[in-house]
Amino acid sequence: RPCIAEMGGKNPCIVTARADLDHAAAGIVRSAYGMGGQKCSALSRLYVHERVADALIVKLKQQMAAVRIGDPTKREHWLGPVVNRHAYEQYARYVDALRGNGADVIAGGRQLREDGLERGWYVEPVLAEAPLEHPLWKQEMFLPILTLHRYRERDTAMRLANDSDMGLTAGVFGSDEDVRWFQRHIEAGVTYANRQFGATTGAWPGYQPFGGWKGSGSSGKAIASFYYLPQYLREQSRTVVE
């Protein structure tokens, strides 16, 4: 019987100099912090062209400041708690590791215990500009923590985006030509372009093929093409003698 193994992701997004920054900010916040970053398809690595980085950071901070954190059973709250005490403590360790190893924590970083949040593991979403040698660029955290790097040449951005053992999902914000370039070179099984409802996410079940590359999985599903179809077939030699 065929086996589909989905092994997680360390998912990147590239924002080019020609991106719609409002769409980019919306998609980045939703993807990095939705469900508390506790999903395999969450965005955790952001590469932004240096020409638009400052403007995008302003928009990201505005959207992050508007996030309402609290009881997820109440509709007015967009961000609920992390899953348990271990995740809550890991969050604090990761934030300390960012600050202690040369990163600039641009927004977030606090564990929240006031204003009715003492009965749960609530944390602020984090945006941090981190040096490329920081180990958290490589580690899947499963938390609302996003690292950012400014790039000058888009080939550098692509090299960095692909510099991972994983390849589940990836996103881009840019022009039509940027999108074509991205899709030719990115090493990920599920890609999105200019999607303000989530820069990275999984495939839409029943409508899109799904499958990770590299360490993110073996095989795919949804029978999207002849690449996957043979995995669900078995050869049988039949001989009839009359």
Predicted regions and their residues:
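ALDH superfamily catalytic-core signature
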Residues: 1-131, 155, 193, 236-242
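Conserved C-terminal structural/oligomerization subdomain of aldehyde/semialdehyde dehydrogenase
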Residues: 14, 26, 68-72, 80, ...
